[in-house]
């Protein structure tokens, strides 16, 4: 009788473990050569390795839609620039049609597993275009992102901050989906590009096959000015300075700056889930992320060691700067079990 009971318990445990290991989750992210793309793909790898879940990842998505899909329970995980929950909560920009009540309701359904710097917005052009930098935007055609979403919102804001120009009045904007970005950069559709960048950036590296590129830093006076400081206070935006020598380019790229630093607005975000995700699942996913930081996440692409994965300091995560979403309780448990401190304002 004792033997039968023991065997029964073992069988039950095995079935429970098997069911947990075979959990299938869905995830949406940006292009696979971007920080959000690599990050979510890495999560699928560490989740499988830890036998937490099988995550089916769809890349090349517009994250505006992906974040809403998570809030509505249509997708389990999405990469989310933190500006998007802010826009959703206010029902403005790409979420204007939701209405404030619906937007606030959807935002209340979002929670964070971990954060990272998605990109630093910047201006660049092929040397062959004879483009003159920030002072030369007027009257030009600028590729500034996909048809809707955080990248386009941030690009328009950055151009207005630097030049005072608005799309359609001072310059012509070109938008295409991320899957067509490299082609659009290379085919001459635009004079210059104001896009999210990693260091080194995959799109720029691919574009070098068509010629040398120049990147323009934000002018120091603009970076230190009152207007930019206001922009830096927008949830999901942090000021970034980086030594040009650490940007990761070995040739074909010139960086224009008054000194040896690149300056720009950084976009931070993270992997979001629905608040209704099981506590143990959120904890297991976050634990798998923490355990895979060095051998998976930071080793996955040249720009990943530069992307602030594994940070919990709110100066880098921007979790409490008007950000309407918090960490999932399961994620908090995983972080704290691993010895990290999560600020109370982010719980």
Each PLM stretch: what is its role?
Residues 1-7:
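Bacterial N-terminal signal peptides that target proteins for export
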Residues 25, 39, 197-211, 215-223, ...:
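An extracytoplasmic/periplasmic, membrane-proximal ligand-sensing/linker region
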Residues 71-115:
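N-terminal segment of the mature folded domain
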Residues 8-9, 19:
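Cleavable N-terminal signal peptides
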Residues 82-83, 91-93, 99-102, 127-129, ...:
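Pocket-lining segment of extracytoplasmic ligand-binding domains
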Residues 15-21:
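Sec/Tat signal peptide C-region and signal peptidase I cleavage site
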Residues 22-56, 119-187, 198-201, 325-330:
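Bilobed "Venus flytrap"/periplasmic-binding protein-like clamshell domains
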Residues 133, 138-157, 235-284, 288-311:
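Ligand-binding clefts/hinges and TM-proximal coupling segments of bilobed small-molecule sensing domains
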